[in-house]
């Protein structure tokens, strides 16, 4: 079990989990002087991703495909980033096929391009930025003639001090940042900010707590929280509902907003009552979702982006000044212990899960003392 100290807060979890919390993505609108050149990069990059999926399914390696596709996209960093994204898509498809027991086909409708970060390249070899008073100048490398394509990006003003510090760190070869340009309704640039730097600029003051521990059980229609003390005694329980989001046809964007609002409300409540540690399931150790007989239940499961809600919850908890613990969820549902907790404490199944998650977090904290 590993832990990272970030400003005032600590994140404790498996290596698989911590690897997913290295960066936070911020998004800005971008306008390029020569949009046609940028669109060409995006179309070719996206085509490489699509074309690499079948060979990767068939067992070819990223190194092999790098040689094959170099004539199509003659820039190793762009190419490596594209092929790794294709590999991620393949791994996701294989996981879904295992869940469903049927062949799943990839459907990639949008086009985009990305370049992984590297501090040795002064942040990023192919995408650079410079912070001005009210905007950010962007330059993107053309992979065919090696020249720069220039543009202007517009982030919220609150992000400019953070970006200025990242620019300085990159120039000193102390930090790298990944970057991605996408095209949907409008051109957007997405920058990966080191998590520690993001928290430095956006952490909120938190009252001193009493060492209490809160276990979270994230569900498609509700958020259950159980607070315990260092002896494992239950202090309080809460359920934050957003049951409307599971109705057929409910807008996806609105559903996400309601779930995130419930998370924020729960964290504000926990801060007021003296909680110092919040505990979530480590979903990065879970390989598959379990589908059930109910069609409506399966719809809830398949459309509920639980891992995305977890990521948001972890980052927001760190921003609020909590220490975050990620525990192996094995045994927290559908187990003898789970049934016993429901029976003895009179908890419903979701509250029982939140309680067991809190106890697992307490156990991990005691183990690392």
UniProtKB/Swiss-Prot annotation:
> Record's InterPro entries?
Transposase_put_N
Query: Which domain of life does the UniProt lineage start with?
Result: Archaea
- NCBIfam families, per the entry: tspaseT_teng_N
- Write out the similarity annotation: To A.pernix APE1276 and APE1804.
What is the name of the protein in this document? Answer: Uncharacterized protein SSO2105
Organism lineage string: Archaea, Thermoproteota, Thermoprotei, Sulfolobales, Sulfolobaceae
């Amino acid at each position: 079990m590993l832990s990272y100290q970030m400003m005032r807060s600590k994140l404790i979890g498996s290596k698989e989990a911590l690897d997913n919390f290295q960066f936070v993505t911020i998004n800005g609108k971008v306008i390029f002087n020569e949009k046609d050149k940028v669109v060409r990069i995006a179309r070719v990059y996206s085509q490489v991703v699509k074309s690499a999926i079948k060979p990767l399914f068939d067992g070819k390696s990223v190194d092999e495909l790098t040689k094959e596709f170099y004539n199509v996209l003659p820039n190793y960093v762009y190419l490596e980033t594209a092929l790794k994204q294709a590999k991620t898509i393949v791994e996701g498809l294989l996981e879904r096929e295992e869940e469903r027991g049927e062949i799943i086909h990839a459907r990639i409708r949008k086009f985009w391009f990305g370049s992984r970060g590297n501090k040795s390249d002064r942040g990023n070899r192919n995408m650079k930025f410079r912070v001005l008073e009210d905007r950010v100048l962007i330059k993107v490398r053309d992979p065919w003639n090696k020249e720069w394509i220039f543009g202007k990006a517009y982030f919220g003003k609150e992000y400019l001090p953070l970006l200025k510090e990242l620019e300085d760190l990159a120039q000193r070869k102390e930090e790298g940042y990944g970057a991605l340009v996408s095209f949907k309704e409008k051109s957007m640039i997405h920058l990966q900010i080191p998590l520690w730097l993001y928290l430095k600029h956006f952490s909120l003051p938190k009252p001193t707590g009493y060492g209490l521990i809160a276990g979270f059980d994230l569900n498609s229609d509700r958020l259950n929280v159980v607070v315990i003390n260092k002896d494992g005694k239950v202090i309080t329980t809460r359920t934050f509902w957003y049951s409307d989001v599971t109705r057929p046809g409910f807008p996806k964007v609105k559903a996400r907003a309601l779930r995130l609002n419930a998370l924020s409300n729960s964290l504000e409540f926990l801060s007021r009552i003296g909680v110092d540690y919040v505990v979530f399931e480590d979903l990065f150790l879970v390989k598959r979702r379990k589908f059930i007989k109910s069609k409506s239940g399966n719809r809830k499961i398949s459309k509920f982006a639980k891992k995305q809600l977890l990521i948001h919850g972890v980052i927001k908890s760190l921003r609020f000044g909590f220490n975050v613990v990620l525990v192996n969820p094995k045994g927290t549902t559908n187990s003898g212990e789970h049934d016993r907790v429901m029976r003895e404490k009179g908890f419903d199944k979701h509250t029982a899960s939140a309680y067991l998650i809190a106890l697992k977090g307490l156990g991990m904290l005691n183990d690392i003392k």
